[in-house]
Amino acid sequence: MAKILVVDDSPTEIHVLQTILEKNGHEVVVADSGEAGIEKAKETMPDLVLMDVVMPGMNGFQATRQLSKQSETANIPVIIVTTKDQETDKVWAKRQGAKDYIVKPVQEKGLIEHVNMVLSS
């Protein structure tokens, strides 16, 4: 299926997302910070990025903006996956270049529906 980069500083969240995605046939690459996510995206050229927001250093909004502004990664869609559930956060994510927004905790069916929707657009 697709190669998906998961960017999250929580090993538990990475494990949950990786398990769901691999169970559904996707190849998963991981990074534990916004900075590492940008570098990993350049190295692996994933089909999609799942990006946490609250991380030390560069947050997920900043990393998403960087990915959307760099020519080599600008066409890689990003889905924000976060505990932040405010409408202002969702609007801000879109302004930074995110294609979709999922609130944690994720459920397998919902995650896969969002992933498939973004990958098919």
Residue ranges and their predicted role:
Residues 11-29:
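Two-component/phosphorelay signaling modules centered on CheY-like receiver
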Residues 15-18, 62, 85-100, 109-113:
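Alpha4 helix (beta4-alpha4-beta5 surface) of REC/receiver domains from two-component response regulators
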Residues 30-39, 60:
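Helix N-cap/capping motif at the beta->alpha junctions
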Residues 39, 61-74:
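Short amphipathic alpha-helix used as the core "switch/output" element in two-component signaling
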Residues 44-50:
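Active-site beta3 strand of CheY-like receiver
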Residues 55:
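Receiver (REC) domain active-site loop signature in two-component systems and cognate sites
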Residues 104:
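A Lys-centered signature of the CheY-like receiver
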